[in-house]
A protein has these predicted regions:
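P-loop NTP-binding core
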Residues: 16-330
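Extreme N-terminal basic, low-complexity initiation segments
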Residues: 2-14
């Protein structure tokens, strides 16, 4: 359920509401100061915050958190800007840092799946199967990827037809969110790779996510897809997912020696200043290593961790993880 925070463990679960009362059982309310739960601020009426009354873990690290607090959708409606490359490398460096990572490929072209699927893997369940059956979980679809410590929900060409068949379904925007919900708390980072389109796959990704990361190529017409994905995100915030927040705009394929790349970066900086995202990133350079790593089924964390572009992606990953750690337990 979007906007709902939960804690796992023993004890009564209570839900805070905008009036400052806390529901500890059906039809039974207590003032928030008796329960230890804080009422939400006035701008956040309607959000439910789960907390413990009795028992439960003694520290925040031992408790589950809001199901989508660590879910990041990597989206841009322009192709070729580095969405899959960003997912691949952020996942690789996050896992190298000891984090539990899940990648979800929502693109029917399945580029991320092709790169990260193990040679001996024969997935019997893909994201298409999950959405087709309106499954309550991703059980069976989550498999180990070729990246150490990173799991994958693979995509397939059949996802296209499933998306078309789902257009008339009630609640179609929540298919991925509902399936991901039982698993999200098991990971420190969930990355959703989005296709460059306005369709049900992207809508599902942005509904399931708490954060949106937008890679933007430092080139002519760089911001073509940015405004469209931001407009889509704003519509979803109003209708479906009020928690969706811009994590950052990531400049990619930067060539410092070219004037048009520098001009594009200035334009991107202008959009960053206007959008005020949670994080600001230095540009990711255009580099051979970033193009070669996927050909070997590796992220830069394995292929060229000390290269300049590898260090840049590692820095981006560190920023993201530090922000999520701070936000989840705020």
């Amino acid at each position: 359920m979007p906007g709902c925070s939960r804690r796992a463990g023993l004890g009564w679960i209570c839900l805070t509401c905008g009036c400052g009362l806390v529901a500890v059982a059906s039809g039974f309310f207590l003032p928030h100061w008796l329960t230890g739960c804080l009422p939400p601020p006035l701008w956040y009426y309607g959000r439910t915050i789960a907390c413990f009354i009795i028992g439960g873990p003694s520290s925040a690290e031992e408790s589950a958190v809001s199901s989508n607090d660590r879910v990041v959708a990597v989206a841009n409606l322009k192709g070729g800007v580095g969405k899959s490359t960003t997912v691949l490398n952020v996942a690789g460096f996050a896992a190298k840092a000891g984090r539990r990572v899940l990648m979800i490929d929502t693109d029917p072209q399945a580029s991320l799946t092709q790169v990260t699927l193990r040679e001996d893997a024969r997935p019997t369940v893909t994201l298409a199967d999950v959405l087709r059956s309106r499954a309550a979980s991703l059980e069976g679809a989550i498999i180990p990827s070729v990246l150490p410590g990173v799991d994958l929900v693979p995509s397939s060409l059949s996802l296209e037809s499933v998306l078309n068949q789902s257009l008339s379904l009630e609640g179609r925007e929540y298919l991925l969110a509902e399936a991901l919900d039982p698993h999200a708390a098991a990971y420190d980072l969930v990355l959703i790779d989005c296709r460059p389109a306005i369709d049900l796959s992207v809508t599902n990704a942005l509904t399931a996510a708490r954060w949106m990361l937008v890679p933007v190529e430092c080139s002519f017409m760089a911001l073509d897809g940015y405004e469209h994905v931001m407009a889509l995100a704003e519509r979803l915030r109003k209708r479906i997912n009020p928690d969706l927040t811009l994590l950052g705009i990531l400049p990619t394929r930067y060539r410092s020696g070219t004037g048009h790349s520098q001009e594009a970066l200035k334009a991107i900086d202008g959009y960053v200043a206007q959008a005020q995202p949670a994080l600001r990133f230095q540009p990711i350079r255009l580099a051979v290593a970033a193009a070669d790593a996927p050909a070997y089924g590796q992220s830069l964390a394995q292929f060229a961790p000390t290269s300049a572009v590898g260090r840049e992606y590692e820095t981006v990953t560190g920023q993201i993880l530090a922000w999520l750690d701070q936000e989840v337990w705020r």
